[in-house]
């Protein structure tokens, strides 16, 4: 009896066909990188102050002193949300009184920005914040906008796998590309914050669905040796490339509507990929469409300049997927040991996700150039992914994950010790923290898959990755803490990251251990460990079914 991989082994692992699929599917991830982080510039909040109408009868001295000062980071700046009561200072101006000399400004009555705001255009010309005045009493709408995008990501995670199982990988891949690109384009015509946010939620659904289906399609078409590299370096690195393109677009296009228009262009350029990316032969076989699957394999063999056997699938009945025991979510809590491990995994995924997305979204709040900071935040991800891949090949999982979490959280805690004038050092520490947390995040898929038995492995990875979506939903509010104290987000994120690093040490080690098949074969969390564990040689290849559901 031959399985699918044996039936197509004659194709080889890394011919022209595999290289083309690797590159095209990875390239299809690029729009996900800038769409996923576009809110950084679409909803950027520029410096602002209360507007004083030109019609107000004020002397130049009173006009220049119409907005009170407040302390921010140890220095006095103009208040963003208050002004002196206009009727009062207009009366003083008419009487010829001078501010500060004849009138004590500290005793004057203040009022809110009844005539709107004046926004600085030094960094942004136009954002959704300036469009709909999402500041002061309405500043809560900015993190909510981002959170609702990630709610869409959560919803898309639920449906993307089911849709691709029902309608095919290729069809759903391009349909979700169209959703992501099309609804991003529709956002340009938003007439209200509510309309923009609802459309943004739908963009989030398309964004993650495209990512997941491209991942599934690649892991099903590519061979075992290439599959692992594709699932770690391929999709992650190209996501980071898209992320790096975002600040480049935003630097030259500082109007939010024009920026959105520019960001839809790469999605349109993906349309020709339809004629180069095939359907998954594995999926076609599962649908008993054997002739179509053979046609794809024959074309691949021709591209690789390899002779095709007379019969590729000699016993189609034997190639049907093996039936697996049905699992339920409650199986992840069936015993005390697996329940503790599941709860620990949920916390690890959620809080690592909070750190990753909060640091990514916080780049405009760093000192210096917002566009350069965003680019550096994206650039640091590439060495982080490469480092994670290299570490996973030889070193114990729980120790390396804990180490990079300690690194990431520790440097974030050091930021509060840096003098305000040394902002370049603060930025460097933030990037080092992002490096550590990104490395840890990319390792969690493999680690979780190795801990759980076959019967619940896919479900475990799926449920824990859902926890990471919850983390991304609450991450914008960690950034929002900076409105109260500039250091507060780093103190909270750093502390939580160090704590989950400690938590990671209580997981069992999975390197060198045979993948468990049943709940009884699962290793115990550290405080339940007793007796001597048997160490078996680990299979050199990952379980394909694990990799398919990893992201």
UniProtKB/Swiss-Prot annotation:
SUPFAM superfamilies: MFS general substrate transporter. It comes from the Eukaryota. It is found in: Apical cell membrane; Basal cell membrane; Mitochondrion membrane. ATP binds at residues 218-225. The chain crosses the membrane at residues 21-41, 142-162, 172-192, 198-218, 233-253, 258-278, 338-358, 372-392, 400-420, 427-447, 461-481, 487-507. Glycans are attached at residues 57, 64, 91. Interacts with PDZK1. This is Solute carrier family 22 member 4. It comes from Papio anubis (Olive baboon).
């Amino acid at each position: 009896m031959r399985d699918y991989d044996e039936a197509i082994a004659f194709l080889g692992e890394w011919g022209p066909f595999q290289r083309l699929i690797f590159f095209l599917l990875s390239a299809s991830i690029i729009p996900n990188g800038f769409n996923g982080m576009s809110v950084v510039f679409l909803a950027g909040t520029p410096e602002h102050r209360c507007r004083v109408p030109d019609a107000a009868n004020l002397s130049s001295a009173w006009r220049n002193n119409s907005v009170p000062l407040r302390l921010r980071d140890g220095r006095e700046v103009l208040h963003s949300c208050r002004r002196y009561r206009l009727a009062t200072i207009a009366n003083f101006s008419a009487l010829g009184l001078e501010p500060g000399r004849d009138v004590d400004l500290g005793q004057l009555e203040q009022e809110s920005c009844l005539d709107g705001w004046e926004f600085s255009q030094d960094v942004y010309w136009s954002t959704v914040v300036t469009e709909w005045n999402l500041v002061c009493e309405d500043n809560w709408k900015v993190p909510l906008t981002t959170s609702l995008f990630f709610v869409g990501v959560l919803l898309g995670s639920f449906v993307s796998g089911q849709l691709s199982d029902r309608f095919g990988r290729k069809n759903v891949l391009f349909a979700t590309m169209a959703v992501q690109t099309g609804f991003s384009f529709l956002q340009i015509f938003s007439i209200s914050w509510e309309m923009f946010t609802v459309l943004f939620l739908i963009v989030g659904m398309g964004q993650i669905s495209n990512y997941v289906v491209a991942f599934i399609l690649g892991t099903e078409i590519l061979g075992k040796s290439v599959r692992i590299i594709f699932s770690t370096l391929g999709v992650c690195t190209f996501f980071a490339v898209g992320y790096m393109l975002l600040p480049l677009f935003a630097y030259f296009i500082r109007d939010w509507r024009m920026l959105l228009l520019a960001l839809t262009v790469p999605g349109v350029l993906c349309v020709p990929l339809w004629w180069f990316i095939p359907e998954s032969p594995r999926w076609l076989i599962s649908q008993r469409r054997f002739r179509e699957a053979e046609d794809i394999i024959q074309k691949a063999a021709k591209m690789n300049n390899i002779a095709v056997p007379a019969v590729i699938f000699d016993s189609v009945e034997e190639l049907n997927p093996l039936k697996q025991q049905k699992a339920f979510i409650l199986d992840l809590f069936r015993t005390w040991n697996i329940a503790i491990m599941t709860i620990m995994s949920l916390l690890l995924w959620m809080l690592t996700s909070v750190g990753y997305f909060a640091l990514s979204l916080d780049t405009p709040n760093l000192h210096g150039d917002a566009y350069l900071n965003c680019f550096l935040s994206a650039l640091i991800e590439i060495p982080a992914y490469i480092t994670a891949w290299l570490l996973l090949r030889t070193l114990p999982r729980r120790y390396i994950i804990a180490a990079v979490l300690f690194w990431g959280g520790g440097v974030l805690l050091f930021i509060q010790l840096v003098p305000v004038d040394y902002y370049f050092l603060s930025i460097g520490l933030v990037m080092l923290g992002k490096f550590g947390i990104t490395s840890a995040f990319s390792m969690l898929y493999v680690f979780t898959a190795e801990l759980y038995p076959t019967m619940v492995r896919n479900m475990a990875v799926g449920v824990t990755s859902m926890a990471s979506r919850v983390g991304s939903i609450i991450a914008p509010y960690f950034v929002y803490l900076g409105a109260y104290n500039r250091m507060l987000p780093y103190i909270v994120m750093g502390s939580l990251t160090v704590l989950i690093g400690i938590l990671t040490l209580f997981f069992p080690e999975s390197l060198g251990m045979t993948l468990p098949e049943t709940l009884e074969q699962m290793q115990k969390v550290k405080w339940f460990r007793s007796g001597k564990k048997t160490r078996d040689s680990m299979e050199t290849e990952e379980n394909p079914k694990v990799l398919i559901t990893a992201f």
